[in-house]
Amino acid sequence: MININNINPEKPVLIVGPTASGKTSLAIAIAQAQGRVVVNADALQVYDGWRVLTARPTPEEEDAVPHHLYGHVPFTAHYDVGQWLQDLTPFLAQNPVIVGGTGLYFRALTQGLADIPAIPPDIRAEADARSHTQRLADLHEGDPALVARIDCDNPMRVQRGWEVLRATGRPLSAWQDETPPPLLPLGNTTPLALMPDRDWLNARIAQRFDQMLNEGALDEARANLPRWSSAGGAAKAIGAPELIAHLHGTLPLAAARDAAVTATRQYAKRQRSWQRSNTQAWQSVPLP
């Protein structure tokens, strides 16, 4: 693992890793040892209503050290990386531990983010109404350079590219090519990339989802049911569609559990793929 005594207390710490790899516990350990705050860099943990299902820190963990940008976005709102950078900025002076599994957030933080106009609600609704396959086909035609850059299996990345192309008439790849300097260059941080063994991680994913069910994930989904149809990014929480399907009576709980575990493992696979391509300059932390 990591010897915390070797971490420079004068630099922000970045921790990236696939879901269920132990990022939260490491972040808290570093924050406790060095008197830091923990700041979220997970695009799903920003939403209220999903504490259990998105594996946000527990109330006890939040009491142990200050935590920020967890559950601060309304369930029905849309939230993007530009808003996250704005929300993060006030905490940078505190040399925080920035932790999460959203590679786009870390790339924007350390490499810069293009100043793209906001997406109008009608364009977003149009994007939501199209299938992933349709959006990807449009991108192949309108922004092939972006298709070569992104994980095309990630619906959020594909939809973002589609929305920018539709709203601005200009490819997202062209906007990205004009990216300004980063808010926090990687060289000014201690960047840690957790690299878990696949079989070890897959077992943890199954165990953790069962633990989530025991700790009330289904009750959490039931509480969110009345606003599910108007959910923004919160609807993309891994395991949420499966639990909602069970509550609608279209999927037995055992099948919902298995489907959610499979979806989580697929998500972790995409995260590991992103890390292999984007964290060569980070300190690799093999696990277990």
From Swiss-Prot:
The UniProt entry, under InterPro entries, shows: Dimethylallyltransferase, IPT, P-loop_NTPase
Coiled-coil segments on the chain, per record = none
Enzymatic class: transferase
Q: Which NCBIfam families match?
A: miaA
A GO MF term? ATP binding
In terms of Gene3D superfamilies, this protein maps to: 1.10.20.140, P-loop containing nucleotide triphosphate hydrolases
What family does the Swiss-Prot or TrEMBL record give for this protein?
A: Belongs to the IPP transferase family.
UniProt KW keywords: ATP-binding, Magnesium, Nucleotide-binding, Transferase, tRNA processing
Which positions does the site annotation Interaction with substrate tRNA cover?
102
User: Is Transmembrane helix among this UniProt entry's keywords?
Assistant: no
What taxonomic classification does the UniProt entry list for its organism? Bacteria, Pseudomonadati, Pseudomonadota, Alphaproteobacteria, Rhodobacterales
Where on this chain does substrate bind? Answer: 19-24
Keyword Metal-binding carried by entry: no
The protein, known as? tRNA dimethylallyltransferase
Tell me, what does this protein do in biology?
Catalyzes the transfer of a dimethylallyl group onto the adenine at position 37 in tRNAs that read codons beginning with uridine, leading to the formation of N6-(dimethylallyl)adenosine (i(6)A).
Provide the gene name from the record: miaA
The domain of life is Bacteria
HAMAP family from the entry? IPP_trans
The record's note on quaternary structure and interaction partners says:
Monomer.
* Biological process (GO), any one: tRNA modification
Q: Which reaction does it catalyse?
A: adenosine(37) in tRNA + dimethylallyl diphosphate = N(6)-dimethylallyladenosine(37) in tRNA + diphosphate
- Cofactor(s) for this UniProt protein: Mg(2+)
- Report residues binding ATP: 17-24
Enzyme nomenclature, EC number: 2.5.1.75
